Amino acid sequence: MKVFLGLLLGYSTILILTYQSPTTQHPPKEELEYWCTYAKTCDFCWDCQNDTCINKVINESISMNSIVNCRVTRDSQSQSCFYEISLKIPNYHSMECSYPRLYKHFMSMEKWRDENWPILIRHYCFYLVFSFAFAGCVAFAICKNLRLRTTMKLLMLLSILVLLSQPILNN
C-alpha cells in the first residue's frame, strides 16, 4: 500500500511539473514581448545603465525608479499566466494566456508620474477644504436650527462652487 501511494504521489508530482512552468525572473527571450506587453515595468523587460532604462522590446526609455521586480509563471493546464510583482507590498496579476489584459496598477503608476503630482496634490487639498466646508455647513445648520430647505440650499450652493472650480484646478 505504501509503495502504491508513493508511486501515485511521484506520478502526480511529475504531472504537475509538466503542466506548470517554473516561476522565473528571467523568461526566455522569445517570450519577452508577451510578458513585457502586459506588465510594462517588470525588471526583466528593461536594460538599465546610468539611471536610464531602455525597453528590450519596444525601445522606450524610462527612469530606473519605476522598475519593479517581477516573477512570471505560465500554467498550461489552466491556461493562465501569473505575474508576482514585488513592490513594497507584493501584488499579483493573473490572466488567461490567450486573453491577456494589462496590469492596472502599472497604468495608474504611469499616469501619476512626475508632471501630474502638483495637480493631484491641488485636488486633494481642495477636496480636504471642501470636506471641512461641508461639515461646517451642516454644523452651522444644526446650531442655528435652520430648516431643512435652507440647509439644502446652502449645500447646493457649495456643490455648485465645487463644480465651477474644477476647470481652475486642472490648469
From Swiss-Prot:
Bridged cysteine pairs (disulfide): none
TM region(s), chain numbering: 2-20, 123-143, 150-170
Primary location class: host cell
One GO CC term, this protein: host cell membrane
Protein family per UniProt: Belongs to the asfivirus MGF 110 family.
Organism encoding this protein: African swine fever virus (isolate Tick/Malawi/Lil 20-1/1983) (ASFV)
The protein's name in its UniProt record: Protein MGF 110-12L
Alphabetical UniProt keywords: Host membrane, Membrane, Transmembrane, Transmembrane helix
Role according to the record: Plays a role in virus cell tropism, and may be required for efficient virus replication in macrophages.
Alphabetized InterPro entries for the sequence: ASFV_fam_110
Lineage top rank: taxon: Viruses
Any one Pfam family match given in the protein's UniProt record, by short name: v110
Compartments where located: Host membrane
Membrane topology: Multi-pass membrane protein
